[in-house]
Amino acid sequence: MGDLNTDLAELRADVASHVPAEIAEVLKADREGFVGVIAEAAAKPGTAMPDLTLPDASGGRVPVADGPAVVVFYRGAWCPYCNLALRTYQREVLPELENLGAKLIAVSPQLPDDSLSTKDLEFTVLSDVGNELGRALGITFRLDPATKPTFDTLIGDVEKINGAEEWELPYPTVLVVDGEGVIRFIDVHPDYTTRTDPADILAAVKAL
């Protein structure tokens, strides 16, 4: 396995070198505001996964508490850090999960559309419109309005992309849910340029 967070750090440096200096400064300040943040309201191991169903890109509905499963929250298809992490999980986690009898599910607040299936992902991608599941798990936050013009410039209107009035996103988070729908592992990353290591995910699944 490679080192996902090393790859993410290299991506962060690459992004900073390819955007105008004023945008790079906003992104740097935005990220630094999350470094060291602890998601104290996040669900704890041993609690039940909310009994919700979410839509996939084809319009079907999938129960998120139907384990054993690894549930990965990401910000959206527009986020390069998310795309790198999801591709890594597909390559390094998904094959092992199939051998262990567990599923891999990715969740973002982005509206279900073709963009959710354009990253060559071979696992289920769900849409948590309005962040209902994310809020229930205590892993959402509202973005700083001062950063909105920068994000609008880079990716477009997040509110439009997500189909919601609130400018709200989930922290990148990985949960492992057992066969009874109970959360056995949760790892929340307020710093959106870091992610859960694939080895830690697999260890949590093997411990079920």
Residue ranges: model-predicted function:
Residues 1-208:
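Chalcogenol-based redox active-site neighborhoods
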